[in-house]
């Protein structure tokens, strides 16, 4: 196959989140595959031959046999900590269980959180070009893609996932790098805090597989209170949650106390800004002439914005930080769990995408410098 033909193939889009990896082909409406971005290794001794084969599990198989495994996330706060595991997960994305394709036949669009260490991007490029032999690669910022997915060119995107929360103001398609705000408080921190609160209520989850149970409780039972002080004074109605072993757990005030961490990171001794400040400060760091427009175009993206009551709480908090008569409008697209991937799918299927990527030839000539030249 001629190298040009390969470059003309449909690009693969990988939204490499700290918690969930979404993958599929450009031009598709939704990602073909989504699975937790972790690897599982058996923690017990195999005594029967011919039973469960393999020493490493990824994707649905890891979820299915979770109780038998030690679960490890290769990414923490948007940065890859274990490149061997990360490589294995990407390998699995191309395998017969997933995209069923050869990596050397498709250009790749990979997402990354803004203000990430440049080493992270260089290593990702090295893995894709040298191990997977991809013909071309483009690394894009998550928030910009989320805006693509909504069909706008102006807005401030608040993207809060499992590892990173960031706000990126974009005006008429121009991102303003100096105005970007990022904090490393996101969904996984809420899960950890919920585990601590549940321990205080008398239920202990200690293994890495049980931490996944806590994550599920968070997703199903937690909500954001519009007025936490008031809710603290009232008796919170307890919600019954059925655990995998059939026993039930009554979740009380922990339901709103855990996600409160997103707005008050000092609950766990973190000095970062809360989500509302992240948005407001990003807007305030932008030019005065643009602020009114940005306040009226706040777009939510990422799984941690899916808590019940999130939009109302954010609106009431941002109002306190904005000038008095300014109009604040927050839009929460329904598909915001996947909006980064959807934006990537749109961008990668445009003709102009070919001008943006770094080809294998450029990478071989310039090395990692080529990557920095073409990403922002």
Curated annotation (Swiss-Prot):
GO terms for cellular component: centrosome; cytoplasm; cytosol; dynactin complex; extracellular exosome; extracellular region; ficolin-1-rich granule lumen; membrane. InterPro entries: Actin, Actin/actin-like_CS, Actin_CS, ATPase_NBD. The modification N-acetylmethionine is found at residue 1. Pfam families: Actin. GO terms for molecular function: ATP binding. Keywords: Acetylation, ATP-binding, Cytoplasm, Cytoskeleton, Nitration, Nucleotide-binding. Component of a multi-subunit complex involved in microtubule based vesicle motility. It is associated with the centrosome. PANTHER family: ACTIN. This is Beta-centractin. The modification 3'-nitrotyrosine is found at residue 4. It is found in: Cytoplasm, Cytoskeleton; Cytoplasm, Cytoskeleton, Microtubule organizing center, Centrosome. Belongs to the actin family. ARP1 subfamily.
